[in-house]
Structure formats: C-alpha cells, structure tokens
Swiss-Prot record:
Taxonomic placement: Eukaryota, Metazoa, Ecdysozoa, Arthropoda, Hexapoda
Keywords associated with the record: Centromere, Chromosome, Meiosis, Nucleus
Keyword Kinase attributed: no
Source organism per UniProt: Drosophila melanogaster
Transmembrane segments: none
GO cellular component: chromatin; condensed chromosome, centromeric region; female germ cell nucleus; male germ cell nucleus; nuclear envelope; nucleus
Compartments in which it is found: Nucleus; Chromosome; Chromosome, Centromere
GO terms classed as biological process: chromosome segregation; female meiosis sister chromatid cohesion; gamete generation; maintenance of protein location in nucleus; male meiosis chromosome segregation; male meiosis sister chromatid cohesion; meiotic cell cycle; meiotic sister chromatid cohesion
Compositionally biased region (Acidic residues): 104-116
Protein name: Protein ORD
C-alpha cells in the first residue's frame, strides 16, 4: 500500500506535532497543533527585520516548509535561510493522513438482496457466507477510513551528504529514507505559484494577474509570453520534414490535434475567468463587502457590435485590476490602492490558487501592513466609542476582524493554512489555539537569533485596552 502509491490525492492531512532541535534559532522546541481544525495561527514579534522575500518568518513556519514543501529541496536553497546553520540540528513532524475518497468507500448493502426467493439448505449456507464476507469487508473499509495512517518524518542538517533527504516511517513501521521530492510527491501536492512571484506583481505585471496565473512561479513572469497578443496560442510543428504526399490518416490526425488544442485553449480561458470570479468573492468576504475588485478585460477590436461575445472576443493580455469601495464607480488602480487592501487581495489569490491546484499546505506571511491597519482601526474605535459614543443609541465606530474572516475562508476551502501574524491584537474568538514566537536579543554572538516559542489560546480580555486608557488618563491629568 505504501510502496510507490501516491497518497496525496483524495486524502486529508492533519498535523499533530512539530519538533525543532538545535536549529532555526531554537534549542529544543515541541509544538502540538490544534485538533479543532487545519488553520494554525502563529503570532510573532521581531527584534530585527526579516527579508521580504523569505517565504516564512518564524521557525515554526520555516520548519513546516522544510518538511512539507519543495521550497528548500537542496543545500543551495537551505543556505538562503538566515536562521539555519548547516552542520547541526534537525526538524521533525508527525501527521495523520485520512482517506476521503467517497467513491471508493463500500456502501452498506441491503441484506434482502441475498434473501430473495426460496433456497435450499446449501444455498442458504452460501448466502450466509457471502453476507459474512460482505460485512467483514465493510468493517475493514470503515476501520481504514476511521484510523487513517500516522506518518513521522525527520530532516537532519548535520549530515552534509544527505541535506536533500528525509527519513520517515508509517504507523510505527520500518524507517525509510528518500529524497525530499519523492516524499513530498507521496503525501503532499506541490504549489504551482510562488508567493514571491505574487509579491512582485505590481512591479513587473502592473496589476495584470493573468501573467501570474500563467507563470510557473519560477523566475520572470513574462518568460512564457513570446507573442504578447496571443498568450494562449501554442503553435506546434506537426511535421518538420520534406513535403509528403497527401494522406487521409495524416489529415485526420492533424485535424484531431487542432480540435484538442482548441479545447485546451478555451479551457484555459475559462479557468482564468473562474479564478477571477472566485477571487472577487473571497476578497469581498474578507473586506466585509466594503471593497470589491474588478478585473477589467477589454474586448478585441470587432466591428460587429451586435454579435454576442464569446471567450474568443476578450483580450486577456491586457487585464487591469481595479479595487473599488462599495457603491463607488471610480477605478482605483492597483498601484494606487491602500497597502492593507493589497495584502487582502494577495491573500485572496493565494487561497483560491491553493484550492485550484489541490495544494496541501499554504503559508501566508508578511501581513505587517494589514496587522498595523487592523490594530490602528481597533484602537481608534475603542477610544472613539469610549469618549464619544457612551450611549447605546449613539452611532458606534467599528473595526473589521480581517484575520477572522481569512480563517473562515481557509476553513471553508479545506486547505492546511499557516498564518503568520505580527500583532497580538488578533481580534479572534476566545479559545482559538495560538502558536507564539518571540524573537529575543542575542545572548550569544555566535547565534543569529534566539526564539521563545510556546502555545497559547485567545483569551477574553486579550485585546482589552483599559491599561492604555488609564495611562492616557494619567497623562491628561498631569497636563
């Protein structure tokens, strides 16, 4: 069952435990993941700023990427992690894989189908045997689907010859070793779009998300577009040889190839429009319908204005992204949009693309601007309501729980999402499990940084600002 079989399709993965041993700025850290759902929140604070092109900031998220993604597949990529020193340490994780392919589950059969019509003693005995075998098969299937399989995986950094290798065992069985890509192909699905590529969108693509969707996530987003006027056209030389005599079979083959190519091209266009539409829905939900996003797709030059438009009539190479406030008809182009709203649109694209490619693990990071905006909005609402809206009948200042809404979308889409959030003001519901990572001043100059990591939960008064209000009151009295 576990040989060459790929287990990542039609399965759900549940993280159980993560261990970081003498690496990534940690001595020994053990984290137990929440059993409630697959969205894990990491609250962190930094002493020194991290590079914006790092896929993850905290040791916890970096360890997850080291084990559950192909972000760092070899020694060269490992050297890009500033907190990782090659030559010591390891990271390990345990997770559970649940099969969810309903089509392969054995449905309970009616017992009456074996009892129709008269039967001899021999036939009755045969039916009893069949019924027992059927029930045993159903019980076995239910047992597998309820238990799933446990996987323990470790990646070590103290063996220079095996930096691209992981060791793992399934259900406590024999330990096996294999290259990281092989392990990843067995349990996880590779993300098709680089977060760094998305972040460079407004610099390279001027708001044209089409180029991001069509890019493979490696390098320049424009490299696939040799003809900017028709990015979906792929011209293939079917025959590159001397002229050949007409042949009915060759003609039919060429015609079939053209039909298939046309169907693929139209499917690509439908996919892009579907992504745009779903991103709009996600974006509107996270912003509480205060904003919407329009993807303005111009039509190709067509003199026949009366003819109904089809997918062929749109120029998908010149898509413009316009973010609008609810009820506003003016265009706010991507480059002129508030940075906090840009962050939300970026998150919306990540969530949607992760579901389209059946991505198992998604890390959302670098939400500093969104966190700052949410914190200031909350502080403003707190003080304005306290000083100017004391009566229940008076209008109230509000603040939006953007992070809570991002979690709602992630839960709905069913992807394992790791969210790194650089603020204690999460405004999350009481009781949600948190992983807190606080960077500390260097006690030893030989270490790049030290981290304090522990588990916590959202408390009822976690976002209480009474202490700040008292401090402001004392300052005003002194003045």
């Amino acid at each position: 069952m576990y040989g060459e079989t790929t287990l990542n399709k039609n399965h759900v993965i549940k993280f159980i435990k993560l261990k970081i041993n003498n690496c990534l700025g940690c001595d020994e850290v053990e984290i137990n993941f929440s059993k409630a759902d697959n969205v894990h929140i990491i609250i962190y604070s930094l002493v020194t700023d991290m590079a914006k092109d790092l896929p993850a900031v905290t040791p916890v998220a970096q360890a997850i990427l080291l084990l559950c993604s192909l972000t760092y597949p070899d020694s060269d990529s490992l050297e890009t992690i500033p907190q990782l020193k090659i030559g010591k340490g390891s990271v390990s994780m345990s997770f559970k894989v649940y099969p969810v392919n309903k089509e392969e589950e054995t449905e309970p059969e009616s017992e009456s189908d074996l009892d129709e019509g008269p039967s001899t003693s021999k036939q009755a005995l045969e039916r009893m045997v069949q019924r027992a075998e059927r029930k045993a098969k159903e019980a076995s299937t239910r047992n597998v689907h309820s238990k799933g399989i446990y996987v323990n995986v470790e990646r070590r950094f103290d063996m220079y010859f095996a930096l691209d290798t992981v060791s793992y065992y399934i259900n406590g069985g024999k330990r096996q070793s294999c290259p990281l890509p092989e392990f990843h192909a067995k349990f996880f699905v590779r993300p098709q779009h680089s977060i760094n590529l998305l972040r460079q969108l407004h610099e390279k693509c001027s708001g044209n998300w089409l180029k991001v969707i069509q890019s493979d996530g490696d390098g320049d987003a424009f490299k696939k577009f040799k003809d900017p006027d028709s990015p979906f056209e792929t011209f293939v030389k079917l025959f590159e040889s001397n002229p050949i005599k007409p042949n009915d079979m060759m003609g039919k083959l060429a015609k079939t190839c053209l039909h298939v190519n046309e169907a693929v091209r139209l499917t690509e266009r439908e996919f892009i429009l579907e992504v745009f539409n779903q991103v709009r829905h996600i974006f509107e939900y996270i912003t509480a319908q205060e904003y919407t996003v329009w993807f303005l797709v111009p039509c190709l030059g067509d003199k026949d204005q009366l003819r109904s438009k089809t997918l062929e009539d749109f120029d998908l190479t010149k898509v413009r992204t316009s973010i609008r406030r609810a009820g506003d008809t003016s265009n706010i182009w991507w480059d002129h949009t508030d940075h906090n709203i840009k962050d939300i649109l970026l998150v919306a694209f990540q969530l949607d693309l992760a579901t389209h490619v059946n991505q198992s693990v998604l890390v959302i990071s670098h939400l500093e601007t969104l966190a700052e905006f949410s914190t200031m909005q909350y502080v403003t609402a707190f003080f304005m309501n306290d000083f100017y809206a004391k009566k229940n009948t008076e209008p109230k200042w509000i603040c939006h729980r953007y992070l809570e809404r991002i979690i709602d979308v992630a839960l709905f889409l069913g992807v394992i999402v790791i969210i790194e959030y650089p603020s204690a003001f999460t405004l999350l519901q009481e009781g949600r499990h948190l992983i807190k990572c606080f960077q500390k001043e260097n006690a030893d100059s030989s270490r790049t940084s030290q981290w304090e990591i522990f588990e916590d939960v959202v408390k009822e008064n976690e976002s209480d600002l009474e202490f700040l209000k008292e401090a402001v009151g004392k300052v005003q009295q002194n003045v």
